[in-house]
Amino acid sequence: MERPVTELVLNPGAVPLAEWKAIYRGASARLAESAWPVIAESAAAVQRILAKGEPVYGINTGFGKLASVRIGDADLETLQRNIVLSHAAGVGEPSPVPVIRLMMALKLASLAQGASGVRVETVRMLEEMLVEGLTPVVPCQGSVGASGDLAPLSHMAATMIGVGEIFVGGQRLPAAQALAQAGLEPLTLGPKEGLALLNGTQFSTANALAGLFEAERLFQSALVTGALSTEAAKGSDTPFDPRIHTLRRHVGQIETAAALRALMSASEIRASHLKEDERVQDPYCLRCQPQVMGAALDILRQAATTLATEANCVSDNPLIFPEADEALSGGNFHAEPVAFAADMIALAVCEIGSIAERRIAMLVDPALSGLPAFLTPKPGLNSGFMIPQVTAAALVSENKQRAYPASVDSIPTSANQEDHVSMAAHGARRLLAMVENADAVLGIELLAAAQGCDFHAPLRSSAALEAVRALTRSKVPHLSDDRHFHPDMEAANTLVRSGAVIAAVGALPGVTA
């Protein structure tokens, strides 16, 4: 059975973003040994609480609007099985495997903090599934982000009792078969365990973290394509002077301006028009890159701070406090912080794509760029980059619609017992699609900017940007005459999505380092 190569050791409550990113990128994880006694004590506390004979939500009562219904001791195991099966009610395509593996790791770290009352064997089952590469098939739709991500996490929990389906090495297998192949026995859930597994914000948080990690790469790629576009248009680097940005004081803006200066350093193209250039100021899409991209960087970092906290939290209900043998009902399952963070990421992704599209539009317009119309040597006979710019506009428009805040919506559920919800799940889930659109826009900009710089030969750009141009030309030749454009765009998109564009220039400001 195929297992992830890298295996991390998670310290519950203190896992850095870099480790969550590594899991998203394919690493596996086990809990630190110090977690197991804490888990065992929490489970023992549940038994002591039950022995008191008092009604405790989710342990010996019904759920949601049915919380007032008392459940007898003989039915406690059935109660937990029933909540898992009845709540596994998601719809839609399966969520991406990297996102669900991240969700599993988040749940693992949450359960290990000793506030959920789950037995050691239950937590070990989840850990073994993660290590062995068993990924539950989790439909992507069905969570409103309070009471946690009930439907998605129920699909995960169902596989642990042998119900549902699991991805293993690219195959989609019945859960019982996949567990058997890995030498694992389906669980019989104990008191509170079903509720503990399915109550929490881990699905929303995993999707938001995935969006954050991809948005960071998008941001860095856009610094590179933006600098290359500035060179193609013979734009000025004066707007990136540090004195300007020091006065504005925003850290992201200051770092972005410094990165753009470094990317364009020692450019022959830039030196060629330092004198005798009649233009006084560049268009905003060039001149205001530090202000726009810096604001995006700052807001991504704010979102990262929120998500780093959420990733290390316990969002179960009720919470078990072994030192007092108490179970306290609260609302940590409400994913409003995640919803806000996802909305911030969506805004940043939208704006990164929006200003990039404006740079493409500037490059294809000879009145603005001074380059041949639509970046073709024979305009009229050839259409050049005319329609790629249209495609970029379409993608940016889609992202503008998707950027509408999810957190401002709420629909009451569970007979108005759960009367305000966060909508964090779909707010976070849209992020990967938005980044995919913006990636395609940057791929188009990469081609357009490289084409524009070609017209300035034999002048060369900076060493960093020449490395990017050489990388681009290794996959896509100069456009002398019209040809089938789609393969060129796909090749450029791959350079953006793979991080190759970033690797070509070296270190850039980031979010999660």
UniProtKB/Swiss-Prot annotation:
Q: Which family does it belong to?
A: Belongs to the PAL/histidase family.
Q: What is this protein called?
A: Histidine ammonia-lyase
Q: Which PANTHER family does UniProt cross-reference here?
A: HISTIDINE AMMONIA-LYASE (PTHR10362)
Q: What class of enzyme is it?
A: lyase
Q: Where are the 2,3-didehydroalanine (Ser) modifications?
A: S147
Q: What processes does the entry annotate via GO biological process terms?
A: L-histidine catabolic process to glutamate and formamide; L-histidine catabolic process to glutamate and formate
Please indicate which superkingdom the organism of origin belongs to. Answer: Bacteria
**Compartments reported by the entry:** Cytoplasm
Q: Under which EC number(s) is this enzyme classified? A: 4.3.1.3
* Positions of crosslink type 5-imidazolinone (Ala-Gly): A146-G148
Keywords, ordered alphabetically:
Cytoplasm, Histidine metabolism, Lyase
Q: Which GO terms describe its cellular component?
A: cytoplasm
The pathway noted for it is:
Amino-acid degradation; L-histidine degradation into L-glutamate; N-formimidoyl-L-glutamate from L-histidine: step 1/3
Post-translational modification comment from the UniProt entry: Contains an active site 4-methylidene-imidazol-5-one (MIO), which is formed autocatalytically by cyclization and dehydration of residues Ala-Ser-Gly.
